[in-house]
Amino acid sequence: MTETSFPGWHGTTIIGVKKNGKVVVAGDGQVSLGQTVIKGTARKVRRLTPGGHDVVAGFAGSTADAFTLLERLEAKLEATPGQLQRAAVELAKDWRTDKYLQKLEAMLIVTDGSLLLVITGAGDVLEPEHDIAAIGSGGNFALAAARGLMEADFDAETIARKAMQIAADICVYTNGNLTVEAIDA
């Protein structure tokens, strides 16, 4: 997702990498309006602890919309403790069918350490191939870089950081100011 319906607002880059029993979610800190960087230190990766179960979530798209979705996800996780996939599917169903939520423009990458999922407003809950998920304006660059690095002797955090740096070097809507959260399987 590279833009919202608000003219000129551009997204971010978020990547999730799962390797050797660890999942890392990393996101850049840039918020842009047209050709102007509004903020370079936004935090778009969060750790949630509903019911004492750790979940890491990263978002791309409208910040207000993403926070609304994160609150809903947290409520779903509290209702179904330790069941990330079920909570994600319930959120996606609500997002797809609720008239208010349908207007929200964001995407999420979420993990509990065992599952790595992408949740979209189209009602998709996707577990990515190759244990890598990437969203946002630089998502394809980060995904390609991470796939190339997976066979090397790097851990999940190193792969995520290197992939994000490559995306930041290519995508003008992505910077190198990263927020990184790791979670064990």
UniProtKB/Swiss-Prot annotation:
Coiled coil: none
Record's keyword annotation contains Protease: yes
PROSITE patterns: PROTEASOME_BETA_2
Entry GO terms, CC: HslUV protease complex; proteasome core complex
Annotated keywords: Allosteric enzyme, Cytoplasm, Hydrolase, Metal-binding, Protease, Sodium, Threonine protease
Catalytic activity: ATP-dependent cleavage of peptide bonds with broad specificity
Binding site for Na(+): A168, C171, T174
Active site, UniProt feature: T12
Superkingdom of this protein's organism: Bacteria
Function description: Protease subunit of a proteasome-like degradation complex believed to be a general protein degrading machinery.
Subunit field text: A double ring-shaped homohexamer of HslV is capped on each side by a ring-shaped HslU homohexamer. The assembly of the HslU/HslV complex is dependent on binding of ATP.
Protein name: ATP-dependent protease subunit HslV
Source organism: Dinoroseobacter shibae (strain DSM 16493 / NCIMB 14021 / DFL 12)
